[in-house]
């Protein structure tokens, strides 16, 4: 943690896929470096006690955001059971980090993972802050047009750099649509780490050396690395 100023940490709560991280574990981890770590709560809207889990995580454990993963939880983002979570987070000014993109478990339904499904959420809860993880890959275009039109929607770049062509297209299209400032730095640790993500950003333009393909201005790259995530999410 020596080289880290601030980091958001979280687990996942998806009983359908057998991934259940106790929020108490995250809260205890935050206590090891309270000046550097911000914890998010993981909730599974498929569980009947989701409201109790939310209240305990926020009020008792002092976690400051919420992690959702509809594709892992086997639930449509617009399912009736999702709306109380959105409403709770909007009222409490809690940002939601949502995995709205592909994944590898066979039992995780892709039909629930399209980023464009979140447009109705943004329309009904305009003050809700939401971050689409991994830019919603491979449906990156949907994510970009969504965050362009919704002021409180963002996307993070975690877990993209080890797919170089997708990484290149994602940032290039984001630049063309004028939404680079809506992209947040992320690593997807432990699958990769912040150093690897920063190295990929610093080497971004090397991918197209010797070609006429567009380059990304160094200033844009540096702005992404130093994106004011905590200010955007009101967590500073």
Where are these regions (language model features)?
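Catalytic pocket-lining loop regions of alpha/beta-barrel enzymes
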Residues: 64-65, 78-185
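Catalytic cores of Mg2+-dependent Asp-rich isoprenoid enzymes
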Residues: 188
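Mid-to-C-terminal alpha-helical segments outside catalytic/metal-binding sites
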Residues: 1-2, 6, 55-56, 177-184, ...
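Short, well-ordered alpha-helical microsegments
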Residues: 23, 50-51, 139-143, 167, ...
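Acidic catalytic loop of the alpha/beta-hydrolase fold
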Residues: 162, 191-192
């Amino acid at each position: 943690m020596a080289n880290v100023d601030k980091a958001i940490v979280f687990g996942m709560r998806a009983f359908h896929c057998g991934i259940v991280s106790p929020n108490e574990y995250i809260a205890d981890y935050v206590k090891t470096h309270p000046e550097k770590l911000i914890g998010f709560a993981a909730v599974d809207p498929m569980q009947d006690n989701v409201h109790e889990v939310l209240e305990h995580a926020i009020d008792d454990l002092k976690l400051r955001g919420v992690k959702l993963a509809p594709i892992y939880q086997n639930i449509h983002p617009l399912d009736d059971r999702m709306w109380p979570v959105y409403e709770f987070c909007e009222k409490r000014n809690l940002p939601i980090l949502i995995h709205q993109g592909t994944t590898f478990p066979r039992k995780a339904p892709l039909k629930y993972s399209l980023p464009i499904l979140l447009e109705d959420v943004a329309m009904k809860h305009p003050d809700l802050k939401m971050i689409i993880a991994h830019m919603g890959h491979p449906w990156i275009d949907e994510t970009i047009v969504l965050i362009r039109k919704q002021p409180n929607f963002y996307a993070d770049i975690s877990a993209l750099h080890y797919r170089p062509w997708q990484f290149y297209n994602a940032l290039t299209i984001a630049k063309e649509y004028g939404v680079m400032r809506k992209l947040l730095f992320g690593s997807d640790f432990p699958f990769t780490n912040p150093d690897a993500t920063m190295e990929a950003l610093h080497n971004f333009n090397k991918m197209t050396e010797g070609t006429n393909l567009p380059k990304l201005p160094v200033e844009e790259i540096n702005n992404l690395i130093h994106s004011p995530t905590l200010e955007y999410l009101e967590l500073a």
